[in-house]
Structure formats: structure tokens, C-alpha cells
Amino acid sequence: MKKVLIGAVAASALLLNGVAFANADLAKSSGCLNCHNVDTKLVGPALKDIGAKYAGKDDASAYLAGKIKNGSKDVWGPIPMPPNAAVRDDNAKVLADFILTLK
């Protein structure tokens, strides 16, 4: 029984790690990483800083998904974030949820 439990935990960890990599790939293919980095500020804020700022807020996922699709200005400084209408609504939600895990 112990071996089965350990195996299940290990498989879950690998699956979750794979999801994180898939979401990072989505961030790259969507153009997010042209201006953002996970850990450090580039043109835009670090994704982990965004995740930390909005963590625990009721509408954080929907709010961030909206910013991903529609862009924003005067939120993180003078450089506006351009809209990214090419990102589908469902992918914007996946990206927002991914960012919220990076606190």
C-alpha cells in the first residue's frame, strides 16, 4: 500500500510539473515572454511579481485574463501593455491561472 501511495504522489508531482511547463510554453508561444520573465523585470514586470500582487483576490484570474487580451496602461509604470487579441479567451484564463501560481 505504501508503494502505491508513493507512486501516486510521484506521478501527481510529475503531472503538475508537466502542466507548469505546458503553461510556460503557452506563455512563450503567446508572446508574453517577449516582454516578461518569470523571475525578473524586463520591459514588463516579472510574472511572479504579478502573481504575488493579485494572489488571493476574488476576481484575479478574470482580471488578469482581461489584461492579457485587452492590454493595460498605468498599472505597472509608464510603459503600456499592448492588447493581445490573438490569444483565445480560454488560453488567457490558463495564462492568468499560471501567473497566479508564480508568487
Can you annotate each of these PLM segments?
Residues 13-15, 25, 40, 74:
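Generic structural signal for beta-strand residues in well-ordered domains
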